[in-house]
Amino acid sequence: MSLKWSACWVALGQLLCSCALALKGGMLFPKESPSRELKALDGLWHFRADLSNNRLQGFEQQWYRQPLRESGPVLDMPVPSSFNDITQEAALRDFIGWVWYEREAILPRRWTQDTDMRVVLRINSAHYYAVVWVNGIHVVEHEGGHLPFEADISKLVQSGPLTTCRITIAINNTLTPHTLPPGTIVYKTDTSMYPKGYFVQDTSFDFFNYAGLHRSVVLYTTPTTYIDDITVITNVEQDIGLVTYWISVQGSEHFQLEVQLLDEGGKVVAHGTGNQGQLQVPSANLWWPYLMHEHPAYMYSLEVKVTTTESVTDYYTLPIGIRTVAVTKSKFLINGKPFYFQGVNKHEDSDIRGKGFDWPLLVKDFNLLRWLGANSFRTSHYPYSEEVLQLCDRYGIVVIDECPGVGIVLPQSFGNESLRHHLEVMEELVRRDKNHPAVVMWSVANEPSSALKPAAYYFKTLITHTKALDLTRPVTFVSNAKYDADLGAPYVDVICVNSYFSWYHDYGHLEVIQPQLNSQFENWYKTHQKPIIQSEYGADAIPGIHEDPPRMFSEEYQKAVLENYHSVLDQKRKEYVVGELIWNFADFMTNQSPLRVIGNKKGIFTRQRQPKTSAFILRERYWRIANETGGHGSGPRTQCFGSRPFTF
């Protein structure tokens, strides 16, 4: 490696370390190892919504000080799940305010008696604001519904010692102009029309504001001297893979640190010592996207071992992929080769579970993505679960990782209070997802009012901050503003633009799509000279509704919209368009309105994951593009299980 590159990596490491100090501690995904144990708390929790007028009865009566059932009637609530669709009560489905969860966990004796062991409580997602107590003692608070947070509860559970601990979590789903996403509480004061004290939650985003414990809650242990964080950056010189790492160890300043890199067969291909360094991998197997290489998604394992002078040892294994990302004036490059985003936008959304994590649904979705020939998706409009990103790493599905910056439309949402929180959210997001090879770009917002005057400073500050957190990935936000009015566009690396020609305007006029889309692309590129992704397009289709000639909301109309977009995209992808992401992968729930028939129906699959006509149109297109661009997929591959084919 050249001295120039060595100096760059040293400088980069110093910058990453300085940026990481903005957040206290790392956020490694909890997993078992020879030194770590894990206890999942998924299952039924006690649950109670605070129905008092001010929603503060739980705090006033200190429900956290005794078992929740002693405060009044409780429900059984599954975790993970949203609470909204679990009962038959519309009042709970639409509830705004504080809800309370409680669970008692039985602790292994060694957890409570071994003072050389840390016991950590981790909540992977609590939407939106959460306050947590253990045995009635406050341990942590967190704002934001999509990223994990932790509390070291060792002293609490080892002071007895105890055999159980009672975990109480209060969650408030109220959104304000300064939350992410923003919202507004509107009080209806006309008592001739509304009950006294009546209020509703207004939002400017088009999905249901599901709430609750959406992902797993776990207890895990580490030694008192432990691996706190790992940052990995990869590069390639000729056929040598370069893996630069920085490792944070907490609990002691006197330790030895060993690092090994193993290939998929378990063979050690490189090793090092010390808390920072660089591993060189001759003839490295690169991480390639699905359909871009005959062996996509190659993953190595970085095994880290820390040993103290007292012989306390901690182990952690981090899966990594060796790959590079770069952007030119008209191309998006992965490992130096042009990459075209042929993908979808998604939502974490399903029947009954709401936004609750569900393994069967997740695996089904990935099988559908590969059936489509899709190689990418955007985490619209918030960070998805870590398990989603782990599967993307394993399957080669490229990710545009989006924060919850959706619905930023009011002027007050561009103020300093909102900006401070947005910066913190990006720090949390980068800290969590920085080591995933599938993540190739950060998105800091979706459809903000970026033509407002404060947007220029807001997005310049936000994007500069995100780039300082991660120098290796491009940064974007998704715009629906006019090309010559968007004040944030000068600061992004890739233009992402949403448009719904013949849908939200020129209703039913399919003939305007191609000229309007062509003008859109030419205007954006002429103005900004950056690669462009068509980050949203589509039309609602009610399953089973057929009209010929096509009419809005029929499957034929959705099909015709896609075909008209594709005609222009086929021309522009030869120039500067680097991707297309259909809106949406599947139908999803929204607030009730005259414009939504039990949710948004722009999915190419139903909410139950059954294909509409447009799914077959997109499948044919994506496999054709993969073949035309030299992808390694001559068509869908079929694996047989008995007499039934399973296509993936």
UniProtKB/Swiss-Prot annotation:
Query: A single GO BP annotation from the record?
Result: chondroitin sulfate proteoglycan catabolic process
Signal peptide start and end residues: 1-22
Q: What class of enzyme is it?
A: hydrolase
What is known to happen upon mutating residue 428 to K? In allele GUS-SA
Carbohydrate-modified residues are 172, 416, 627
Q: Name one GO molecular function term.
A: hydrolase activity
Q: What is this protein called?
A: Beta-glucuronidase
Name of the gene this protein is made from = Gusb
